[in-house]
């Protein structure tokens, strides 16, 4: 990047729409289920038929409150719904029911690890609203599927507290992880159950001003989010540099863009509307939502251990590195897998490496998730225990791991019974003979070892393991090698 760009910084905030996994829609009994035939999960309410009246889904409120507890937000005892008026084919009522003036949650924060540093990203508010339908295009024609219309959402609005793409991605991934842990949404980006809108402006470094922001709609991957933010930052800086004497508000008008991944650029969709354009007013068909402290406290008590807390526990209780702990807690199912394995294996550091690196890497290559791969936590624990007990070597363990991936459900003991040739060599006489031959063939390494160069010992061990195809027990190799060297 040019040195000119280095004098500027981005100011980033996110608006995240999260579909809640309730059984029915927000204001009607129509099913909330993705993938059904178009326009089969609809009602008079979500299609806006005259005379239909909304009834608030209690489960959606509980899930919103649970999120508020998880982010340590201020949960309003009194909140209210408003109508946001706009015309679009996917909104048959020509308005959305949302919370504009009095949201259910104010404030809160998302805890994240950014490049090894603990960070807190502040939230402005979280409110409940219903989703719109979906336009589906068929050549020159378009149809509308109202199955999604009326699906309950929470919209999570952050403060403009991020200053680079890495911040935004860390915030987004940490938010998804938190939502997964508390179980209020499946957060399936491909199905649209979580959608990210990114607001970004730029300013000279050190300046406190907030200039006009541009919204980039519907980021459906974290990689695209990072790319779009970087490209938009450069576009805005170029505009300001090319028009240095112009009012900044006129240089970058508030607008909505989309990301074009093929052209690697943001593309203008429309200029921004103001709040007045939406003609917000209180929803006349819904009463004020009233909560009690005891209701909130009852929901708070159902919170599970959250990712950030689990991260610190893994470091303190299991002695894991920050990097490994961060990988484990990023996925609730992986964390659960690891904790189940910990019941049968107490070498937590080695176990965490096998879960994240060895089996995690194999699963990534095959395009599967570890918890659904057919590998069981007990099997991984058994494998690590076998290494620690000298039953197998690390090299053989990797071969067994490959076989476990090929034969889902089989544990190391079963594989070793079927393939006894994988067991380490048990003929100590043969091993002593190989050690003597290696020592005889490497006189320079013997001299180095005698002169205190410890690397020479590692070299000799490596030669022995090579001669035995990795089947010699490393611990016993070291013992016998030292005995052989002491003879001289």
UniProtKB/Swiss-Prot annotation:
Pfam family, one: GatB_N
Keywords per UniProt: ATP-binding, Ligase, Nucleotide-binding, Protein biosynthesis
Alphabetical list of InterPro entries matching this protein: Asn/Gln-tRNA_amidoTrfase_suB/E, Asn/Gln-tRNA_Trfase_suB/E_cat, Asn/Gln_amidotransferase, Asn/Gln_tRNA_amidoTrase-B-like, GatB, GatB_C_1, GatB_Yqey_C_2, Gln-tRNA_amidoTrfase_suB_CS
Reaction catalysed by this enzyme: L-glutamyl-tRNA(Gln) + L-glutamine + ATP + H2O = L-glutaminyl-tRNA(Gln) + L-glutamate + ADP + phosphate + H(+); L-aspartyl-tRNA(Asn) + L-glutamine + ATP + H2O = L-asparaginyl-tRNA(Asn) + L-glutamate + ADP + phosphate + 2 H(+)
Membrane-spanning parts: none
Domain of life: Bacteria
GO molecular-function terms, A-Z: asparaginyl-tRNA synthase (glutamine-hydrolyzing) activity; ATP binding; glutaminyl-tRNA synthase (glutamine-hydrolyzing) activity
GO biological process: glutaminyl-tRNAGln biosynthesis via transamidation; translation
Entry's EC annotation: 6.3.5.-
Top EC class for this record: ligase
Cited function: Allows the formation of correctly charged Asn-tRNA(Asn) or Gln-tRNA(Gln) through the transamidation of misacylated Asp-tRNA(Asn) or Glu-tRNA(Gln) in organisms which lack either or both of asparaginyl-tRNA or glutaminyl-tRNA synthetases. The reaction takes place in the presence of glutamine and ATP through an activated phospho-Asp-tRNA(Asn) or phospho-Glu-tRNA(Gln).
Record-stated family: Belongs to the GatB/GatE family. GatB subfamily.
Subunit-structure text: Heterotrimer of A, B and C subunits.
NCBIfam families: gatB, PRK05477.1-2, PRK05477.1-4
Name of the protein this chain belongs to: Aspartyl/glutamyl-tRNA(Asn/Gln) amidotransferase subunit B
Originating species: Chlamydia pneumoniae (Chlamydophila pneumoniae)
Gene name for this UniProt entry: gatB
């Amino acid at each position: 990047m040019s040195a000119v760009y280095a004098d500027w910084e981005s100011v980033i905030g996110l608006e995240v729409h999260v579909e809640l996994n309730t059984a029915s829609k927000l204001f009607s009994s129509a099913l909330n289920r993705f993938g059904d035939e178009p326009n089969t999960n609809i009602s008079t309410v979500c299609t806006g038929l005259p005379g239909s009246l909304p009834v608030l889904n209690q489960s959606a409120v509980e899930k919103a409150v649970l999120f508020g507890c998880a982010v340590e937000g201020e949960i309003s005892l009194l909140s209210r719904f408003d109508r946001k008026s706009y015309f679009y084919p996917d909104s048959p009522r020509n308005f959305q029911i949302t919370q504009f003036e009095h949201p259910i949650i104010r404030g809160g924060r998302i805890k994240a690890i950014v490049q090894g540093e603990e960070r807190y990203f502040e939230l402005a508010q979280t409110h409940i609203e219903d989703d719109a339908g979906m336009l589906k295009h068929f050549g020159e024609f378009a149809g509308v599927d109202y199955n999604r219309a009326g699906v309950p959402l929470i919209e999570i609005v952050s403060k403009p507290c991020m200053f680079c793409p890495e911040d935004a991605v860390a915030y987004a991934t940490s938010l998804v992880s938190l939502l997964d842990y508390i179980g209020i949404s499946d957060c399936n980006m491909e199905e649209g159950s979580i959608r990210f809108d990114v607001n970004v402006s730029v300013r000279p470094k050190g300046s406190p001003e907030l200039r006009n922001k541009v919204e980039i709609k519907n980021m459906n991957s974290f990689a695209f989010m990072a790319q779009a933010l970087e490209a938009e930052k450069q576009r805005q800086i170029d505009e300001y540099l090319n028009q240095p004497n112009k009012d900044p508000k006129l240089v970058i008008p508030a607008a909505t863009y989309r990301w074009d991944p093929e052209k690697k650029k943001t593309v203008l969709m429309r200029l921004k509307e103001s709040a007045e354009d939406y003609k917000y007013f209180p929803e006349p068909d819904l009463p004020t939502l009233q909560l009690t402290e005891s209701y909130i406290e009852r929901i708070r008590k159902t919170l599970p251990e959250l990712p950030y807390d689990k991260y610190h526990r893994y470091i303190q209780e299991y002695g894991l590195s920050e990097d490994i702990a961060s990988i484990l807690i990023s996925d609730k199912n992986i964390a659960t897998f690891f904790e189940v394995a910990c019941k049968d294996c107490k070498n937590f550091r080695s176990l965490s490496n096998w879960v994240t690196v060895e089996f995690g890497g194999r699963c990534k290559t095959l395009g599967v998730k570890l918890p659904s791969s057919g590998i069981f936590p007990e099997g991984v624990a058994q494998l690590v225990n076998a290494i620690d007990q000298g039953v197998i070597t690390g090299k053989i363990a990797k071969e067994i791991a490959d076989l476990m991936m090929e034969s889902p459900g089989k544990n190391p003991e079963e594989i070793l019974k079927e393939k006894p040739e994988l067991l380490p060599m048990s003929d100590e006489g043969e091993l002593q003979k190989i050690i003597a031959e290696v020592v005889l063939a490497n006189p320079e390494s013997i001299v180095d070892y005698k002169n205190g160069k410890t690397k020479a010992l590692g070299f000799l061990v490596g030669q022995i393991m090579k001669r035995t195809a990795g089947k010699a027990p490393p611990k016993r190799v070291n013992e016998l090698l030292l005995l052989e060297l002491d003879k001289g």
